[in-house]
Amino acid sequence: MLTRKQHELLLFIHERLKETGIPPSFDEMKEALDLASKSGIHRLITALEERGFIRRLPNRARALEVLRLPDSIAPGLSPQKKFAPSVIEGSLGKVASVQPVRPAPAPQNSEAPATVSVPVMGRIAAGVPISAIQNQTHMLSLPPEMIGAGEHYALEVKGDSMIDAGIFDGDTVIIKRGDTANPGEIVVALVDEEEATLKRFRREGASIALEAANPAYETRIFGPDRVHVQGKLVGLIRRY
């Protein structure tokens, strides 16, 4: 399975070769994927080459050849720059961006309260970080008082690293989208632009700590440029 960034880079190279016959430069790839440095592009290209999706042609500058595409990629699909909610399951086809949620109008002549439709974006790791793949699976109707104002999405939890915070494998967490968090808040964090996880946010000096709520898991420390908050926990749904 390719990570989201690997998919994006493969598609970007493929589309550029189709359009111009010339592979993109490292600067163009870095800009297209919104990465901070070329080293991230080098890692992605190496991973794609090891998996048999591309090859580098010897003795030629900027020489890349796409050998194959994942079966699930729709024809003509183009990569998107920005990250939406981090998920792992569902189709690896067209990337779906989260749209702001709005209350659904109640039927006329009905006393039923309005609900808010929240996109369920697949599953998020509450354990070892897993590949971040974006795909909306379905919509979830919630009472508006459960989430309040703002843009929200839902994720199904996979893993047991947050059990001491009352978050269990199979639960559905409601996330308010945002890129900041206060120490102690539970967040969806994107690590190295590729992996997503649900953890408690802490600061360790200039570094960021992603803290599990299970003693079986170690707290992981990252430089501030390696972690990007994608939203924070505001609700939880459990089915029995």
Curated annotation (Swiss-Prot):
Q: Which GO terms describe its molecular function?
A: DNA binding; serine-type endopeptidase activity
**How's its activity regulated?**
May be constitutively autocleaved; RecA is constitutively activated in this strain, leading to continuous transcription of recA.
Active-site residue list? 161, 199
Q: Mind listing the GO biological process terms from this record? A: DNA repair; DNA replication; negative regulation of DNA-templated transcription; proteolysis; SOS response
Q: Entry's Pfam families? A: LexA_DNA_bind, Peptidase_S24
The record's subunit annotation is:
Homodimer.
The entry's protein name is LexA repressor
> Highest lineage ranks of the organism?
Bacteria, Pseudomonadati, Pseudomonadota, Alphaproteobacteria, Hyphomicrobiales
